[in-house]
């Protein structure tokens, strides 16, 4: 499971008790490996989730804390930076490391160098996750495997390539007959691909899959935009009937990223940077309008960035406000009791509180639907607060 550290699955920092409860329920419901990352690579924001996983592992023998480093480019992201982070991850008690290359920026020979250096810096297993957006992912995997990486993430061919991962079948065939042979049966893999191919075609037909994000865009290497961010940006522009501003926004993204301390572009920082770039382009003036998330990033609410933020932007967007310097969770008081009190009329299991914590409106709509199905009533005519239902 991909887990955003102190942000869990949401877009804001949550209290430690919410992090602890979510990890516990995730493992209780069958999750084994929890891939924990922070959008700023701020190690402090990962510790609580790692500790929570390890407590359960010590108590029940279940759970694997995998810390993911969000790979990105920039003069601050040196080889020394990555090896230092690997050592810190081992020291904090993680079980393994994932290099999360969400934008497909890790090119083959750099991958070889990175894997060799990180394997020398830590004894932890290293897993590599990349995307095909820039077109180099399969070659990157080949060089990474030769350099000693332990695991590579792939996708079945109907949903591979583009903003997804390299195709499983291609990598299996690549290593066939070598010391890296997976032993997987291509005939069985073909059956799996055949099962999913009609669904892929249906997604294309309905528009759920946009052909724009299924090919290779070499400009990814220029603008450093990850696949999920690219898909989100296309949707935002489409909603505003501004798809013709696509490349204007792509050019603005690196500028916004620089203003915000050059963070890796991964959820939620990718959405923050991407949405602000869209605003800057469509408003015709940079930071004329700033999202609440942009303001929180400038306030230090998400943690520490690898480089200082643009003071001129800070002065324009949040003039005179205090900048926070501690880990993101330090500013959020325990909230599980408060959240449970808010949604107590809908609670049927502990997991409901967590659903509400992360997605309050979506969860509430679901709880109402569930109640209607269970009681066979029309909730649009019911007074749920006072427990009055039409008959």
Language model features with spans:
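Conserved, mostly hydrophobic/aromatic
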Residues: 36, 97, 148, 171, ...
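Active-site beta->alpha loop and helix N-cap motifs at the rims of alpha/beta catalytic domains
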Residues: 1-52, 56, 64-90, 107-108
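Glycine-rich phosphate-binding active-site loops on the catalytic face of alpha/beta enzymes
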Residues: 36-39, 101, 147-164
């Amino acid at each position: 499971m991909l887990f955003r550290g102190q942000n869990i699955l949401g877009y804001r920092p949550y209290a430690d008790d919410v992090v602890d409860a979510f990890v516990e329920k995730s493992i209780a419901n069958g999750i084994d490996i929890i891939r924990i990352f922070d959008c700023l690579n701020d190690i402090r924001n990962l510790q609580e989730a790692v500790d929570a996983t390890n407590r359960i592992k010590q108590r029940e023998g279940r759970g694997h804390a995998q810390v993911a480093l969000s790979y990105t480019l920039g003069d601050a992201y040196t080889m020394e930076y990555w090896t230092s982070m690997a050592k810190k991850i081992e020291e904090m008690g993680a079980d393994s490391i994932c290099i999360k290359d969400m934008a497909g920026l890790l090119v083959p020979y750099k991958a070889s160098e990175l894997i060799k250096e990180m394997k020398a810096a830590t004894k932890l297993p290293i897993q590599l996750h990349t995307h095909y957006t820039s077109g180099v992912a399969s070659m990157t995997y080949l060089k990474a495997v030769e350099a000693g990486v332990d695991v590579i993430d792939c996708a079945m061919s109907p949903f591979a390539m583009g903003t997804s991962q390299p195709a499983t079948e291609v990598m299996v065939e690549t290593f066939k007959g070598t010391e890296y042979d997976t032993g997987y049966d291509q005939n069985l893999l073909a059956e799996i691909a055949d099962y999913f191919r009609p669904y892929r075609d249906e997604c294309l037909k309905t528009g759920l899959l946009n052909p724009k994000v299924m090919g290779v865009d070499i400009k990814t290497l220029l603008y450093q935009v990850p696949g999920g961010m690219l898909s989100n940006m296309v949707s935002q522009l489409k909603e505003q009937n501004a798809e013709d501003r696509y490349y204007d926004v792509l050019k603005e993204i690196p500028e916004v990223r620089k203003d915000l301390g050059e963070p890796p572009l991964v959820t939620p920082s990718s959405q923050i940077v991407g949405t602000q770039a869209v605003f800057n382009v469509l408003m015709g003036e940079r930071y004329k309008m700033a999202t609440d998330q942009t303001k929180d990033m400038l306030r230090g609410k998400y943690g520490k960035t690898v480089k200082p933020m643009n003071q001129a932007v800070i002065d324009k967007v949040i003039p005179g406000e205090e900048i926070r310097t501690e880990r993101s969770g330090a500013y959020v008081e325990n909230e599980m009791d408060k959240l449970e009190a808010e949604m107590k009329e809908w609670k049927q299991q502990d997991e409901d509180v967590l659903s509400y914590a992360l997605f309050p409106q979506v969860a509430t709509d679901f709880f109402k639907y569930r109640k209607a199905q269970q009681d066979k009533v029309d909730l649009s005519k019911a007074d749920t607060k006072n427990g009055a239902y039409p008959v």
